[in-house]
């Protein structure tokens, strides 16, 4: 748990919010968001998603004027009013801001865009090409891991003359592509052209996950986010991010990821995440390592280092198992499998495309003998959640202490980087202090995890709240990391809590996001 004096926190917080606002609390990621924002916010983000003056490649034969005319009638501009919650003061939101992005119409009277275009939204509007009218929109479903969102508009006038785009296939290398959208620099639709450079497993900046992505040299700038990438008369993907460290490197979400998202929403009514084996592993490129684990000269695979106890793999696989193949496809010593001709891709792509509770067949070498296991896959929450969009953070306030679960946004905001890997997400996370006589002498404690409340091990934030609220002893004792101890007179602390809430204009002593209690 983290203890921080409020006045010091306020000064520190102000600096942090200026420096990380354009990152949407993800400053450690390599790839920047592609989002058109108000002037101040755009300036803070320009280092990540700035444009390039490099000359764009000429159009190839499969990006024709007819395909451009067809696609332009599907593209829309998205206007977003949003307010992000304060990570360090979780009972409040920051002032509203405006941003924008792109989107396009798909079948079923739906609009597809990026999740980061509408994240933390309060109000959404959409304007179609060639129209001055803005239409109110609602988010039907959102997947932050895959950076996709579905919008709906309850106005039949909007849908007149709108042409839905069909999903195509993964483009080939060097195939020409046209990216549509509303990037910075103007108000009308923009079209940039380029070629497919790579198709590989890539880190998605917004959600912090790794999924299949298309790399292109077509210009992708702030505001392009959510716009379609077109090949012929079909959509090859959704523009979503770029590499700020290099020229002409933009990224497109490919149709397999899009189809997985859309199918999950259609079948389950909501997005449920991407499946994973949830293991940590190492490559087997060293011949001495392969010999030690009794791998034959023809064998290739990966070495399991650790397995998440919450996953189905934990019941069947073991540390030091060698995974040789997945669904009868051999895994190389570099953890990659064959993908389209001579292209290779990380084996996790096969797992991520599975539906909830489907199985993968793993061929495993254990103690020199081969085995086969059917492993059920499902989305498994990370130890520390990488994002917390579209909701207030969970917290609990007692006697001026503010308890919150550990999250990556909190780590980013407080510059705590080394503790992320050692806490489980269901544990009570950090704590800061609202100054009061009741907690005098404790305000200098920081970066300390709460271990016990009155001798009982803390399981999660809700459990901590219950332990505090049902205290029957005169003193409340909190045992912290590094053998630190907090003792409060319970009756006095209970009375002080109400006064502190009133003094700091905090509407409630607690807020729960129940995903933390599972």
Curated annotation (Swiss-Prot):
The active site is at 116 (charge relay system), 147 (charge relay system), 225 (charge relay system). Residues 1-23 form a transit peptide. Its EC number is 3.4.21.-. GO terms for biological process: proteolysis. Residues 98-262 are annotated as: Serine protease. It is found in: Mitochondrion membrane. Belongs to the peptidase S1C family. Putative serine protease. This is Protease Do-like 4, mitochondrial.
